[in-house]
């Protein structure tokens, strides 16, 4: 998992423009231009994320209007004596929903009372309770999930529209001989007087009615709706209610996964119930007080592309408890047989996921300081999440020093950060460019044949690594943009996310007309 540490956060919706089809390539360089860097404030005010229906206004309306019957979306096994064990489809009376992550509920079947993870339940008979409803996910994530193994032609999901408030988008997996598996998207528009439609000749009172219709007949869609997109059970938001600073004895260290400069990484079990990753730090690595202060901020940063920080043991030796990612670090994964065989579209998509997580951190005004493949973790379906953000600045080891320390990641660090300690989002952008070379070269060490001192001297004078073998020129040009000596001339992560997500997008419109045959 690399030399530094882990946790999790949330991104900015990207706007759907026009109409869209599938993954095929138009030269990305023809559609993007140098990014006009925007000025940014320095304050950070991260907000905890919750299911789509859990906006503060909606939470109030749930209790205020008496709509307190919820249904379980997944099975859940209690982790503490205060939790409820429940099965998918079980119904609850919500007793207290004043906290975002865990709600007090009473099971209507067993009569028992306890806490349930708020992202595992939804209002009964609501659209959020439907298996095919994926809420506020992006078009790109919809494509990733539908193209996962196990989804047949006609697999579908419905998500919130990224451009029209109160409207939805229908995403369908399709196939043809020319393009193979690909995704088509349709706008579900809302009528002024109520009701929904894709094409005006077929209007429905509810989205549920619309789905039932198109599961019986394709009626102009690319394919009949066959089955909801397969979904992985989500991580709970935290281990349990009030499980933040935990007892060391509640963690069992089961298997060492790796050893870094400042400690070990373990596969562990919390409270005899939950698989977790545990980073154990060597005593003296950082001040427990400073770590706990930073961790309080880190736990608020939540996004699908950031490893979620679950809990901490704040006395030395410090334990950092996070979600477990089955394939470990991106660096190790790239060097392994499975990662080494990845093709360019996979690599670009992984880069886009990292850029998405970093774009969220950019919006939150939070700096990673140690962005590299060793600090990106890989899970099922090639999902990538950023780990170890923010903790590098807390390290007090003399060897973690850009001038003479052997542990400092010089080859990934922007010159203004290495020479003058000026760490900003723009220095993270520089590091991201180096990470792109790691992806393209399947884990090769940057600046091959050069030591740290040589790298620092050469980079200060404008040296760039040459284009890696097999790297498209358009992608290398983006790398070079991230390595501009003037930090303000480097692109934003928002721009990098857009560029990479659309790198293989076809020239077809983003949304298909409803009467397409």
Swiss-Prot record:
Residues 132-229 form the SH2 domain. SMART domains: SH2, SH3, TyrKc. Interacts with ITGB1, ITGB2, MS4A2/FCER1B and FCGR2. Interacts (via SH2 domain) with SYK (tyrosine phosphorylated). Interacts (via SH2 domain) with FLT3 (tyrosine phosphorylated). Interacts with PTK2/FAK1. Interacts (via SH2 domain) with HCLS1 (tyrosine phosphorylated by SYK). Interacts with SIRPA and PTPNS1. Interacts (not phosphorylated on tyrosine residues) with CBL; FGR tyrosine phosphorylation promotes dissociation. Interacts with CLNK. It comes from Rattus norvegicus. It is found in: Cell membrane; Cell projection, Ruffle membrane; Cytoplasm, Cytosol; Cytoplasm, Cytoskeleton. The gene is Fgr. It comes from the Eukaryota. ATP binds at residues 257-265, 279. This is Tyrosine-protein kinase Fgr.
């Amino acid at each position: 998992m690399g030399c530094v540490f882990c946790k999790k956060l949330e991104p900015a919706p990207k706007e759907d423009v026009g109409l869209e089809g599938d993954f095929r390539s138009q030269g990305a360089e023809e559609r993007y231009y140098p990014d006009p860097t925007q000025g940014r404030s320095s304050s950070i005010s991260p907000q905890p994320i919750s299911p789509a229906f859990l906006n503060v206004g909606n939470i109030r309306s749930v209790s205020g209007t008496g709509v307190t019957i919820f249904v379980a979306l997944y099975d859940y096994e209690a982790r503490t004596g205060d939790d409820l064990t429940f099965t998918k489809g079980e119904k609850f009376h919500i007793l207290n929903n004043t906290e975002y992550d865990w709600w007090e509920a009473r099971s209507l079947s067993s009569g028992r009372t306890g806490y349930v993870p708020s992202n595992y339940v939804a209002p009964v008979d609501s659209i959020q309770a439907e298996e095919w409803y994926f809420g506020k996910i992006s078009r790109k994530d919809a494509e990733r999930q539908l193209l996962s193994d196990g989804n047949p032609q006609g697999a579908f999901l419905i998500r919130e529209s990224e451009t029209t408030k109160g409207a939805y988008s229908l995403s369908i997996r399709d196939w043809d001989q020319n393009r193979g598996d690909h995704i088509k998207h349709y706008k579900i528009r809302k009528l002024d007087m109520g009701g929904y439609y894709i094409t005006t000749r077929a209007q429905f009172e509810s989205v549920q009615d619309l789905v039932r219709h198109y599961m019986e007949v394709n009626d102009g869609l690319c394919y009949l709706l066959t089955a909801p997109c397969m979904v992985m059970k989500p991580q709970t938001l935290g281990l349990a209610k009030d499980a933040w600073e935990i007892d060391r004895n509640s963690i069992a260290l089961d298997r060492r996964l790796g050893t870094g400069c400042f400690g070990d990484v373990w596969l562990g079990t919390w409270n005899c119930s939950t698989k977790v990753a545990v980073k154990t730090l060597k005593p003296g690595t950082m001040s427990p007080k400073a770590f706990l202060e930073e961790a309080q901020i880190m736990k608020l940063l939540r996004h699908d592309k950031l490893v979620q920080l679950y809990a901490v043991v704040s006395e030395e030796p410090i334990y950092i408890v996070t979600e477990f990612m089955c394939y470990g670090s991106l660096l190790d994964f790239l060097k392994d047989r499975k990662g080494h065989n990845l093709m360019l579209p996979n690599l670009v998509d992984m880069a886009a996921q990292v850029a998405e997580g970093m774009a969220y951190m950019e919006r939150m005004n939070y700096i990673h300081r140690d962005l590299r493949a060793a600090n990106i973790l890989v899970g099922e379906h090639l999902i990538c999440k950023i780990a170890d953000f923010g903790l590098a600045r807390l390290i007090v080891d003399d060897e973690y020093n850009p001038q003479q320390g052997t542990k400092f990641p010089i080859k990934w660090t922007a010159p203004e950060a290495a020479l003058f300690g000026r760490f900003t989002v723009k220095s993270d952008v520089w590091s991201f460019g180096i990470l792109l070379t790691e992806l393209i070269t399947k884990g090769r060490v940057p600046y091959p044949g050069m030591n740290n001192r040589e790298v620092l001297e050469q980079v200060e004078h404008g040296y760039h690594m040459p284009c890696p073998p097999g790297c498209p020129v358009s992608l290398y040009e983006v790398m070079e943009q991230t390595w501009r000596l003037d930090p303000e001339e480097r692109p934003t992560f928002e721009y990098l996310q857009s560029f990479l997500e659309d790198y293989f997008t076809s020239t077809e419109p983003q949304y298909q007309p409803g009467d397409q045959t």
